[in-house]
Design a protein with these regions (language model features):
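A generic structural motif
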Residues: 44-59, 195
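A cross-family structural signal marking well-folded subdomains
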Residues: 49-51, 89, 93-261
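Surface-exposed beta-strand edges and their flanking turn/coil or helix-capping segments
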Residues: 32-35, 60, 242
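Glycine- and hydrophobic-rich flexible loops that cap the catalytic core of alpha/beta enzyme folds
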Residues: 1-25, 29-32, 38-41, 45-48
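Short, conserved secondary-structure transition motifs
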Residues: 52-81, 233-239, 254-256
């Protein structure tokens, strides 16, 4: 009986494993859809996960490091004590001359739980802030170098996309930005994460905060008031509960065209 079990176990080495080969001519939308569908039977994945997978595999443009910054921030926001493990186990990341670990260090003492963003939240906010776009499928195309006007793929677009995404993530994880945004949300009455029932609404609120902070369109105190009002109204009306990316895109377009104050 044991021999039979060992024979079957040994036979695993010669078993054919299902492999799906995708043509390089496929549109990125189709590849994204296949990625999400294949994984739908296990842990539910989304386009944010596909973006993370794509940047993690791109060492040429520093995508692998960007993935770590996003992943580590998300982890530390929930478990601050992870910082000590990170410092002792990922020396390569911690010794980066850019000093990324210093930008995450403040999280080791963070006890705030109102907004604990996941990886896809960070990607989405950074993308909306820097590109004034909302659909992550478009980000995937841009990371591949897609020129939306000529429909060609260009290296300079990949480089520009990574530069902007790095900047967007840096603004997201900035201690001052993050803490001031959380203060604004708490001042609006949302003092516990139990009261945060819409991740999409708070993601857009943070993107709006960063956009206004960068544009200097209004004063710092006015930024908080606008963000508070926008967040409360979006929650009460359920603005981002259905087809959030379409609603994001519409709002970002209007903000770009006429501003927020008007």
């Amino acid at each position: 009986e044991l021999d039979g079990v060992l024979t079957k176990l040994n036979a695993i080495r010669t078993q054919a494993i299902g492999i799906i080969e995708l043509s390089e001519t496929l549109e990125i939308d189709i590849v994204t859809d296949i990625f999400v569908r294949i994984n739908s039977k296990g842990t539910t994945l989304n386009q944010g996960d596909f973006v993370m997978s794509k940047i993690a595999a791109d060492e040429v443009h520093g995508g692998n490091t960007l993935r770590k910054i996003i992943d580590y921030f998300s982890h530390l926001a929930i478990e601050p004590t992870y910082y000590h493990y990170l410092v002792s186990h990922d020396k390569e990341f911690c010794n980066k001359p850019e000093g990324y670990i210093k930008k995450l260090e403040w999280l080791k003492d963070d006890k705030e739980t109102v907004y604990d963003p996941k990886c896809d939240d960070i990607i989405r906010v950074a993308f909306m802030h820097q590109f004034h776009r909302a659909k992550l499928a478009e980000l995937v195309k841009m990371l591949s170098g897609r020129d939306f006007d000529t429909r060609e793929f260009k290296e300079e677009i990949i480089e520009d996309t990574y530069n902007k995404l790095y900047k967007g993530v840096a603004e997201f994880i900035n201690e001052h930005n993050f803490k001031q945004f959380v203060i604004a949300i708490k001042s609006a009455g949302f003092i516990s994460n139990k009261l945060i029932n819409s991740n999409m609404a708070i993601d857009f609120a943070y993107a709006l905060y960063l956009i206004l902070h960068e544009s200097k369109e209004v004063s710092v105190s006015e930024i908080k008031r606008i963000v508070q009002r926008w967040y409360v109204l979006s929650v009460l009306t359920g603005r981002y509960s259905s087809s959030p990316e379409s609603a994001f895109a519409k709002d970002l377009r209007q903000i770009s065209e006429v501003g927020v104050v008007k």
